[in-house]
Regions:
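Short amphipathic alpha-helical coupling segments at ligand-binding clamshell hinges
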Residues: 59, 230-237, 319-331, 421
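Hinge/lid segment of periplasmic solute-binding proteins
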Residues: 103-153, 205-207, 291-293, 377-379, ...
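Conserved C-terminal helix/tail region of periplasmic/extracytoplasmic solute-binding proteins
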Residues: 163, 381-444
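Glycine-centered hinge/linker elements that transmit conformational signals in sensory
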Residues: 221-250, 295
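Extracytoplasmic/periplasmic solute-binding protein
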Residues: 142-148, 153, 177-224, 230, ...
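C-terminal lobe and pocket-closing loops
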Residues: 274-286, 299-403, 440-444
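A structural signal for short loop-to-beta-strand junctions that line the ligand-binding cleft
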Residues: 88-89, 96-97, 126-161, 191, ...
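Conserved N-terminal structural module of periplasmic/extracytoplasmic solute-binding proteins
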Residues: 2-108, 123-125, 250, 299, ...
Length: 444
C-alpha cells in the first residue's frame, strides 16, 4: 500500500517558467497575482474553508475562539465529487478561500488558473515545513497553498514468518526480490509483496525513490521522462516481482484485502503513518507479529523515500490570502493544533509535514500490532526526513495516472511489460499536454 508525491523548482527562473507554463494552458491570465495584504485584511474577516478530514472542524472552533479578527466558516465537503465541486465554485465565483487538496490536485488546479499565488505572504511559514512538503505547494517555485500533512514510506513485515522462512528485512529492492525467492523455496504460495491490479502507486513510490522525474518544468515547457535510467530502474523492480510471481494482486477495493497479510499469504508491505490504525483493527490474527523497518532503498548510502502530501490550497478569488495562509499555517504546524490532530482519537489520520515530527510519532504507533523488537518511532522519523525533493507533478498528472491505471492492469496480467507501459505513457502524456496547448517534449 502506497501513495503519491511532488517536487518543484525553487529558483526565480523556475517561478518565471511556471508562469509561462500556466499561461500556455490558460491559467496565466486568470490566476490571481501574488497576494499582498490589503486594507480589508486589517479588520475582522470571515473565511470559508472546505475540508473532509475528521477532527478539523473541532480545531477550526479552537482557532475561532482565539482569533476573533479572523473567523473560519468550516464546510464539510466530504464526497467523491469534492474537486469537481471546487472547480465549479471557482468558475461561479463562489469558491471558498481555502480548501484541502492533495499535492497532485493542487498542481492541476494551479495549472488551470484556479488558485491564488500566495508566494509573498506565505514565505514566512516556509521554514516550518520540510523541503519536499513546501515543494508540494510550490509547483515551479510559485506557492499556492500551505502543507498540511505527509505520509512517508516505510516497511511493515511479518517478523514471525520472516524468521520461519530464514529471511531478513530487505535493505534494498534487490534484497526484497531475493527474500521473496528464498521464501517461496519453503512455501510456494507465499508472496513477499502485494501489487493491486488497479493501483500503480508502487511504481510511483519506486520511481520517486530512484530519483526519477516524470515531469520537470524547464524554461517555457515541460520535460516528460518516463524512460530515464532512474525510471527504468524502478520499473525493473516491478517487472521482476511480476515475472517471478513474487507479488499477490489483492485489490484494495476488496474489503477482504487485509486477509492476505493477516493470514500470512503476503508477508511484507510498504506503508505509511495513516494506515497503521487501520491495520491494528483489521489484523486480528497477526497482532504482535509485525515489525517496522526502513523502506527498501536503491542506494542505502543515500536513503530516499517517497510521500504523498495533503495541502491547504488558496482558491482563486480569495480576498484575504494572508489571513488564509496564517490560519493554514496554524492548523498544520502549531503544537496546539498538531497535538490534537495527530492523536488517533481525532480520527484525522494526520501525520505532520513539519521539519520536526518527533513529538507526534509515538502516539500513532499501535503497540498491539508490533512485537517491540524494532524502534518503530525511529523508522517513521527517518522516513519523514528522507523524502526526496526532486518529484514534481505535471499539469495533467491526474489524467496520466488514470491512463496508467488502465495499462497497469495489463502489466500485472503479463500482457505487456513495464517498459512498454512507460514508453506508451510517456508518449501519451506528451501528446495530451500538447493537445491542451501546453508545450511538452519527451526527455528520453
Amino acid at each position: 500500500m502506497s501513495q503519491f508525491r511532488t517536487r518543484a523548482l525553487a529558483s526565480v527562473a523556475a517561478a518565471a517558467s511556471l508562469s509561462l507554463l500556466l499561461a500556455a494552458c490558460g491559467g496565466g491570465e486568470d490566476s490571481d497575482s501574488a497576494a499582498k495584504p490589503t486594507e480589508a485584511t486589517k479588520g475582522k474577516v470571515t473565511l470559508e474553508f472546505w475540508s473532509w478530514t475528521d477532527g478539523i472542524e473541532a480545531q477550526t472552533k479552537v482557532w475561532n475562539k482565539e482569533h476573533p479578527e479572523t473567523q473560519i466558516k468550516f464546510v464539510n465537503a466530504a464526497g467523491d465529487t469534492a474537486y469537481q465541486k471546487l472547480r465549479a465554485a471557482v468558475n461561479a465565483g463562489t469558491a471558498p478561500c481555502l480548501s484541502k487538496m492533495d499535492g497532485m490536485n493542487l498542481a492541476n488546479f494551479a495549472a488551470d488558473g484556479l488558485l491564488t499565488d500566495i508566494t509573498d505572504v506565505a514565505g514566512q511559514y516556509k521554514g516550518k515545513y520540510t523541503a519536499a512538503a513546501w515543494n508540494a505547494v510550490s509547483p515551479g517555485g510559485t506557492t499556492f497553498g500551505i502543507p498540511m500533512g505527509s505520509s512517508p514510506l516505510f516497511t511493515a513485515y511479518r517478523a514471525d514468518l520472516f524468521e520461519k522462512y530464514g529471511i531478513e528485512a530487505p535493505k534494498t529492492w534487490d534484497d526484497l526480490i531475493a527474500a521473496g525467492k528464498k521464501a517461496q523455496k519453503k512455501n510456494k504460495k507465499v508472496k513477499i509483496f502485494n501489487m493491486a491490479g488497479e493501483d500503480p502507486s508502487t511504481l510511483v513510490d519506486l520511481s520517486w525513490e530512484s530519483g526519477a522525474q516524470w515531469y520537470k518544468a524547464e524554461d517555457d515547457h515541460w520535460v516528460v521522462d518516463f524512460t530515464s535510467p532512474e525510471a527504468l530502474k524502478a520499473g525493473d523492480i516491478v517487472q521482476q516481482l511480476v515475472d517471478n510471481d513474487l507479488a499477490s494482486n489483492a485489490s484494495y477495493a476488496d474489503p477482504g484485502v487485509f486477509k492476505t497479510w493477516d493470514l500470512g499469504t503476503t508477508i511484507a508491505m510498504t506503508t505509511s503513518t495513516w494506515q497503521l490504525p487501520i491495520y491494528n483493527t483489521n489484523f486480528p490474527k497477526s497482532k504482535g507479529k509485525w515489525q517496522l523497518a526502513d523502506s527498501p532503498m536503491f542506494d542505502t548510502a543515500k536513503p530516499q523515500t517517497s510521500s504523498n502530501f495533503d495541502t491547504l490550497g488558496v482558491l482563486k478569488g480569495c480576498k484575504y490570502p494572508d489571513r488564509a495562509a496564517e490560519f493554514a499555517a496554524w492548523l498544520s504546524s502549531s503544537k496546539e493544533s498538531l497535538t490534537t490532530l495527530t492523536d488517533p482519537a481525532s480520527k484525522s489520520g494526520l501525520f505532520p509535514a513539519v521539519t520536526d515530527v518527533s513529538p507526534y510519532v509515538d502516539k500513532i504507533i499501535p503497540t498491539e500490532m508490533f512485537n517491540g523488537e524494532s524502534d518503530s518511532a525511529k523508522v517513521i522519523t527517518d522516513a519523514a526526513s528522507w523524502v526526496g525533493d526532486q518529484w514534481q507533478y505535471g499539469p495533467n498528472y491526474a489524467a496520466m495516472y488514470s491512463e496508467m491505471q488502465k495499462q497497469w492492469g495489463k502489466v500485472m496480467k503479463k500482457e505487456i511489460t513495464v517498459k512498454e507501459m512507460l514508453t506508451s505513457i510517456e508518449k501519451w502524456t506528451v501528446d495530451d499536454l500538447n493537445d491542451k496547448g501546453i508545450k511538452a517534449v519527451a526527455g528520453s
